[in-house]
A protein has these predicted regions:
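Gly/Ala-rich beta-loop-alpha elbow adjacent to hydrolase catalytic centers
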Residues: 581-591
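Conserved acidic catalytic loop of the alpha/beta-hydrolase fold
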Residues: 563-576
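N-terminal membrane-targeting/anchoring modules of bacterial envelope and secretion proteins
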Residues: 1-508, 512-542, 546-553, 568
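Lipolytic serine-hydrolase domain surface
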Residues: 527-562, 604-606, 612-696
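Active-site signature of alpha/beta-hydrolase-fold catalytic machinery across serine-
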Residues: 592-596
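Short helix-terminating capping/connector loops at secondary-structure junctions
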Residues: 574-575, 600-603
Length: 696
């Protein structure tokens, strides 16, 4: 018997829309191993004689729960995690070259991810400790802890201790959420298979066996976060023994994160590194203990009087992390450039070259850092404006709230970025118009003249996806330009000060950005349709395991891929031929499953992809995992057909000998719908391609 196992794509999908596409009267649905809306479904009765149709529905893992809307705050962590998988490996004749350099780049990326945790916490400590607890004590507003002023004149220690509970609570919440998702995704064991071969990285089951390494990284990030909050408290009222303990714990955490063993994934049957896991857990409790000491020790002393200006030690801490992050990004960029050099597509097919010349990883890291800094700086400006008057240097104004001067220079990038994005939008519009004119000439023999404009516009809009790297480059270049400007000014000690109008414009735009993000998050929490739209971010980003940042949204593939492998093996054991039918992101999942199957199971497996981004996006941005060698390995593993439309903004061709272009819209009749990325199932070409895979 032939089994068609459908795997849907981005933006979620209901079981009915996958099993009964385009039907006004769908039949009954039977669940099979469904948990939380995720699992296998089949229609009753089966709609096609001689075929068993099933669907694997996984959209609930990224857009099902209302709490997924809060993942917008975790986007920087997801981006820095994606950057890890964008990093190229130099593979020559099936063997990796320059492995020490690649491992060094991996370690630096983990350290950068750790620094992002620091930046996120600076957003909380900057607001609650620096502004509300310390500086607002001098303002007429007094802050939300103004009632403490009725106790005594030296209440600053109590103000700081109480305020530190909010950052600690935020960190504890990230700890709790990452632990819960870790148990439901990373801890699901990958099925044991044959010994790993020196082939594509995707055929190694260790990739989906992330329980131990993600657990270790989580412990280290939690430890670092609590140590950072403790240090912020201690610098306001220094105790040498406490500062020494914090420095030792912090340095130990940094060194441990840099160790390759901290994040090493092993095959399912391999022995776990229990000693290192125990050490990381010990560091986590040490970080929590030192925070408890920093919280309570100042309360036992005579108390300190808050001095005008920022919280002692806070600005230097922010600045040191700021420049450390820049150094990490520069070194990673150099390392990635060396790894990417000379790694062009060996097949000679240059339709889709490597994105950003192979430098997508550092560009994505830069965007993640920009996003995190924007949230932290925007929140600081909003609160500073509420309780006083924001300033960047000490001024003789009672209500002045002094923010780090680096914030002012960072704000320079905001209006400049807006101007550059407007210019980019204009360029994309001109490109769209020019492409539409070219397409109009190409389709003249296939469509009647009244259809030309509609079809050419749809195809031209879809082609803009191939310009996506221009957006990455614009944001990255803006940030780089600003950093160079600030670096020159700071290192040469020029007396140039930030230009107030540009700083004001940046502050306003940044405040609007933060408020807009909150509005979108709230709306996504309330509206399932918007939540599915926002969920597209997670459909793409959380396909990848949490290799560098444990607080990133969970990797659904660590549940999806093992479940699909188990189902395919079960169906094949019953004597069936299984056609994995992957649409959009489902095609990426299906390709990963094919490579994970035991060689003995592959002859009974077929692959049908439609609207697939495998070559158009994944091979460009993740060449280590989806280059032509890997895609050729999938072809060698099982018969494969790929359908694509020129009107599809996501899917595209994969390989010449398996591709089949589908006209969209179909003609005649006129005015038939342009389907773009959806409803491949209802095309006649789909049924033809499906049957051809099982016809001798």
């Amino acid at each position: 018997m032939n089994v068609e196992l459908r795997i849907h794509g981005v933006a979620g999908a209901s079981p009915g829309s996958v099993l009964y596409p385009g039907s006004d009267k769908p039949g009954k649905l039977l669940e099979d191993g469904v948990s939380g809306g995720v699992g296998f479904y089949r229609p009753d009765p089966q709609p096609t004689p001689g075929w068993i149709r099933q669907a694997y529905v996984w959209g609930g893992l990224t857009s099902g729960s209302k709490t997924r809307a809060l993942w917008l705050l975790l986007l920087p962590f997801a981006l820095v995690n994606i950057a890890f998988f964008m990093t190229p490996h130099r593979i020559v004749d099936g063997r990796e070259r320059r492995k020490p350099l690649r491992k060094t780049v991996d370690s630096l990326q983990r350290l950068f991810a750790l620094s992002l945790t620091a930046t996120a916490l600076f957003g909380f400590t900057g607001v609650y400790l620096n502004i509300l607890a310390w500086q607002s004590a001098h303002t007429p507003f007094g802050g939300p802890l103004s009632w403490l002023s009725t106790l005594n004149a030296n209440d600053i220690s109590l103000r700081l201790s109480l305020s530190s509970l909010i950052p600690a609570l935020a960190l504890s919440l990230m700890w709790l959420l990452s632990t819960r998702t870790w148990k439901h995704t990373d801890q699901i064991p990958a099925p044991q298979g044959p010994p790993p071969s020196p082939g594509p990285l995707l055929n190694r089951r260790r990739m989906w066996n992330g329980g131990p390494p993600v657990g270790r990284l989580r412990s280290l990030h939690v430890a670092f976060g609590f140590t950072l909050i403790a240090t912020t408290l201690t610098l306001a009222d220094p105790h040498p023994w406490l500062l020494t303990a914090e420095a030792i714990i912090g340095a130990t955490i940094v060194l441990t994160v840099a160790l390759p063993q901290a994040a090493t994934r092993k095959d399912p049957e391999a022995e776990r590194e229990r000693l290192l896991t125990t050490f990381c857990t010990t560091l986590r409790w040490a970080g929590l203990l030192v925070y408890g000491a920093a919280l309570l020790v100042p309360l036992s002393g005579p108390g300190e009087q808050a001095t005008p200006g920022p919280l002692p030690g806070f600005d230097p801490m922010v600045e040191s992390v700021f420049w450390t992050q820049i150094a990490l990004m520069v070194v990673v960029a150099i390392g990635v450039a060396i790894l990417a050099r000379g790694q062009e597509d060996a097949s000679g097919d240059n339709r889709y070259g490597r994105a950003l010349l192979g430098l997508a990883a550092p560009a994505t890291m830069l965007i993640a850092w920009t996003y995190t800094a924007a949230l932290a700086i925007g929140a600081a400006f909003i609160v500073a404006e509420m309780v006083g008057t924001p300033a960047f240097s000490r001024v003789d104004v009672p209500e002045a709230i002094v923010l780090p001067e680096s914030f002012a220079w960072a704000l320079y990038a905001v209006p400049i970025a807006v101007v550059m994005l407007i210019a980019l939008a204009l360029w994309l519009w001109l490109t769209y118009r020019r492409t539409a004119r070219k397409i109009n000439d190409l389709i003249s023999s296939h469509y009647p003249r009244p259809e030309h404009e509609r079809v050419s516009k749809a195809w031209a809009a879809a082609a803009l996806t191939d310009r996506a790297q221009a957006v990455f480059a614009t944001i990255a270049l803006t940030a780089i330009g600003t950093l160079v400007l600030v670096g020159v000014i700071r290192t040469t000690q020029l007396t140039i000060k930030p230009w107030p109008p540009l700083v004001l414009a940046g502050a306003i735009i940044l405040i609007v950005f933060v408020i807009a993000l909150m509005v979108v998050g709230y709306a996504a929490y309330r509206l399932p349709s918007l939540r599915r739209t926002v969920g597209v971010l997670w459909d793409i980003s959380t396909f990848w395991p949490r290799a560098t940042h444990p607080f990133a949204p969970p990797c659904y593939s660590e549940r999806v891929v093992p479940e699909l492998i188990t189902r395919v093996n079960h169906l094949i054991a019953d004597g069936n031929t299984v056609v994995l039918s992957g649409h959009s992101q489902g095609s990426v999942i299906a390709a990963a499953v094919v490579l994970q199957l035991d060689p003995a199971a592959r002859p009974s497996t077929r692959l049908l992809t439609h609207g697939s981004p495998l070559r158009r996006l994944y091979a460009r941005y993740f060449p280590t995992y989806f280059d032509t060698t890997t895609l050729r390995e999938v072809q060698n593993a099982t018969p494969w057909n790929n359908l694509y439309r020129n009107s599809d903004p996501i899917g595209g061709p994969v390989a010449t000998d398996i591709d089949q272009a589908v006209w969209d819209p179909v003609s005649p009749p006129p005015d038939s719908p342009i389907r773009g990325h959806i409803d491949y199932y209802v095309d006649d070409d789909y049924r033809t391609a499906l049957n051809s895979l099982t016809t001798p």
